[in-house]
């Protein structure tokens, strides 16, 4: 079988003030017709640089050697992307290979309709005949990739489509040109789990229905188990292991691969036990009854109800997981509890007392810690890590002297397993995982009774995520704080939460003990969430998919 893509001894470096920084070191890969090769590894491993080299999308500061050969599958690949002229590259992009980016909005022009952009790609490559024919083809391809009401969507702009619909449109643009190879760089990272499942199904159809191969860049091992035929594991710019997907998961040969797989939360293997509380000690740290949160409309537009009549409680010493898709109201509830968003209706009690507009600052001051999703934007870039961690102490415990505050900040750094020398570093000098540890240290500075963690691991690599989750659990058990853990990742929630509340469009779909809700869901929406989550085991994932495929075949 001839290859569609053959990468031979690829080396890529980038010019810096300190000299050339190597990003890819001697990578060799092959992708045949109809194959899905997953390229996995942590941030900085060289995955995306390797993917961009396939389409000649590296910046001018890059120094490249090796060969990146593209073919059409009928003969040995001969087109070397690295030596192709700009005009030839424009031809190769779309016809031989196409890129699907992590954020589809960056690949779509906001001032042109979806249909126009698809038709323009056909025109630029001399496909589709006249204007009317190209328009008809655009609508046809939008329909083929599963976009509802394609004729209407063709006349809409990118901002009028959901994230999943935009990603489908980008894939349609590639398939319409007859591309044989789709390079998908983290194509589902920005999507909800159910939308992710739909895009994965579409990528599967790209090879079964349209004959395309896929080079899949991802850090999600569940997606790898669901979609890939072969896996290449990258670390520090090198491929450390390549194997068929089932072989790699069953018997990883390289220590780094074993470490990577061990760090993946394995959904369906059981959660943590609930907190042990003596009789008569149970009290609610948070109690919500008929909670309503509205966001006012602007410029004459109608307002939006983000949370609609929600009732739940968080008990002392327990972790409550709050799960649901984007727009379900998860973050809004967390912000309302922390006093960052006003409550419109219903009742919200904190520590046994009602929370009102007037009392929300006094009730929450020093008793609630908040861990934000993106630690980079929650730190002042002009303050050192020690100064940021010390801020709550400076504001709420003014009786402390400068030396004592500094000592407390350094002690908190040690508690989250960061060396004391990091105290004088600035946020940009820390990695994402280190910043999230520092964010957790700041949240715990006042020894709060409740911690609100809003998607605290969603931006982290799988191994870093595992370390942060272990740290969170260790500190929660040691300090005994209650926690609201907001996440869209069911595997993460299963690992850390005692109980789970499932939100759907601002309302509670289901709630209960974690093992019960995620192990035997009763609500249709919860069942869809659980079914949509790929597990990091090709054999188990194939068994989970079998009933779905049989249902489709029988329908």
Describe every region a protein language model picked out.
Residues 1-267, 274-535, 540-555:
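ABC transporter nucleotide-binding domains
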């Amino acid at each position: 079988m001839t290859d569609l893509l053959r990468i031979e001894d690829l080396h890529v470096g980038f010019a810096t003030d300190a000299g050339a920084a190597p990003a890819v070191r001697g990578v060799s890969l092959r992708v045949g017709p109809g194959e899905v090769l997953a390229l996995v590894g942590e941030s900085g491993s060289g995955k995306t640089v390797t993917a961009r080299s396939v389409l000649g999308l590296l910046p001018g500061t890059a120094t490249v050697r090796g060969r990146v050969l593209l073919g059409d599958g009928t003969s040995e690949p001969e087109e070397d992307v690295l030596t192709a002229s700009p005009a030839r590259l424009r031809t190769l992009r779309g016809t031989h290979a196409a890129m699907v980016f992590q954020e589809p909005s960056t690949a779509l022009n906001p001032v042109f309709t979806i249909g126009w952009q698809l038709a323009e790609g056909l025109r630029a490559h001399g496909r589709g005949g006249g204007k009317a024919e190209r328009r008809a083809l655009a609508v046809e391809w939008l329909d083929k990739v599963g976009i509802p009401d394609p004729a209407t969507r063709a006349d809409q702009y990118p901002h009028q489509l959901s994230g999943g619909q935009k990603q489908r449109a980008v894939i349609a643009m590639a398939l319409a040109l007859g591309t044989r190879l789709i390079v998908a760089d983290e194509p589902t990272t920005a999507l909800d789990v159910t939308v992710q499942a739909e895009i994965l199904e579409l990528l599967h159809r790209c090879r079964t229905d349209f004959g395309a191969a896929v080079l899949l860049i991802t850090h999600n091992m569940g997606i790898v188990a669901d979609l890939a035929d072969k896996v290449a594991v990258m670390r520090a710019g090198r491929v450390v292991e390549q194997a068929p997907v089932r072989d790699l998961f069953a018997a990883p040969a390289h220590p780094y691969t074993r470490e990577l797989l061990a760090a993946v939360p394995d959904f369906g293997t059981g959660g943590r036990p609930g907190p042990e509380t003596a009789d008569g000690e149970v009290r609610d740290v948070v109690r919500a009854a008929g909670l309503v949160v509205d966001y006012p409309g602007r410029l004459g537009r109608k307002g939006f109800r983000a949370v609609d009549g929600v009732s739940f409680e968080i008990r002392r010493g327990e972790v409550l997981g709050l799960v649901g898709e984007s727009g379900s109201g998860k973050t809004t509830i967390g912000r309302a509890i922390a006093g960052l968003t006003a409550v419109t209706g219903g009742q919200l009690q904190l520590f046994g007392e009602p929370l009102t507009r007037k009392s929300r600052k006094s009730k929450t001051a020093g008793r609630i810690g908040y861990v934000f999703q993106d630690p980079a934007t929650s730190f002042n870039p002009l303050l050192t890590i020690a100064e940021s961690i010390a801020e709550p102490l400076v504001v709420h415990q003014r009786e402390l002297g400068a030396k004592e505050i500094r000592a407390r900040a350094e002690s908190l750094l040690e508690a989250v397993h960061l060396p004391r020398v990091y105290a004088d570093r600035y946020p940009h000098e820390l990695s994402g995982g280190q910043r999230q540890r520092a964010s957790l240290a700041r949240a715990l500075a006042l020894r709060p009774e409740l911690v609100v963690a809003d998607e605290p691991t969603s931006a982290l690599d799988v191994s870093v995520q595992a370390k942060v989750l272990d740290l969170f659990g260790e500190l929660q058990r040691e300090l005994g704080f209650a926690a609201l853990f907001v996440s869209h990742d069911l595997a993460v929630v299963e690992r850390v939460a005692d109980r789970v509340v499932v939100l759907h469009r601002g309302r509670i779909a289901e709630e209960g003990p974690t093992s019960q809700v995620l192990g035997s869901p009763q609500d249709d929406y919860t069942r869809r969430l659980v079914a949509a989550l790929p597990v990091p085991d090709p054999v188990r994932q194939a068994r989970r998919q079998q009933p779905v495929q049989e249902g489709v075949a029988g329908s």
